[in-house]
Amino acid sequence: MIALDQILSKIMQESGSDIYILPGTPVKAKVRGQMEQLGEERCSVQDCADLLQEIYALAGGRSMKRLEEVGDDDFSFSLAAVGRFRCSAYRQRGSYGAVLRAVPFSIPDAEKLHIPKAVMDLFSLKRGMVLVTGPAGSGK
């Protein structure tokens, strides 16, 4: 089974966005819009539970009580020199799974993101409201 720190480091190095930890399948990641397997080994129910325990430990020793009682939990955690992550953990059919969203420490500048000057000029407006909308993962 691939180690959690390797999973998290790999996703940040490859500019991935999401990590999927599900029993019965290898750990998967979304990288540049494409799903990739991280290793060949399928996660057993116990592997998923073990990875979740590690994730909760990284979240400052957060208790798994809510997950066990309610069946889901959402929280964030950081791994020094790697990045921040949001975690949606859940219980389904008696086993645990999780989806992690990578949140890089640094924010790229507008030029690197190819944001037009007209959009950047909106930041200087003194009145009104600017809505930025779009689907999850679209770069809002």
Which positions does each model-derived feature cover?
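Conserved glycine(s) of the Walker
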Residues: 139
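N-terminal "pre-motor" subdomain/linker immediately upstream of P-loop NTPase catalytic cores
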Residues: 1-135
